Amino acid sequence: MAHPITITDANFTSEVLDSDVPVLIDFWATWCTPCKMIAPIVEDLTSEYEGRVKVGKVDVDANPVTPGMFGIMSIPTLMVFQGGKAADRIVGYQPKPALKARLDAVLATAR
């Protein structure tokens, strides 16, 4: 089973903006209850989209620069990056089918 990679302020550009494949990023914090609720869904998506989408997680407390660059004010916030640019932003808990639909919509534009 695949797991999300850890994204930091230091590796954000190389892992996300320079990625050859779309990247789903989960901005989260250890104290955030909705973040804990969405975490298993993000884990599932990592496996389901393996090879097509890179999935990563940014701890906003440990890495404040990256969330600040994108105006992250609420967590969880999930962002999809494609070609080095933000392609979608999802704020708050969403059920798995809703997240898959949003991710699939971005992937459809990549074809």
Description of each model-found segment:
Residues 58-66:
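Structural microenvironment flanking redox-active thiols in thiol-disulfide oxidoreductases
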Residues 4-23, 64:
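A short beta-strand-turn-helix
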Residues 20-21, 28-31, 74:
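Short pre-active-site segment immediately N-terminal to redox-active cysteine/selenocysteine motifs
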Residues 68-73:
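A short glycine-leucine-enriched loop at secondary-structure breakpoints
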Residues 20-22, 37-58:
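Conserved helix-turn-beta segment immediately C-terminal to the redox Cys motif
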Residues 27-41:
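Conserved redox-active cysteine motifs that mediate thiol-disulfide chemistry
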Residues 3, 8, 28, 54-56:
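Conserved Rossmann-like nucleotide-binding pocket used by diverse enzymes
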Residues 80-111:
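Non-catalytic, surface beta->alpha helical segment in thiol-disulfide oxidoreductase systems
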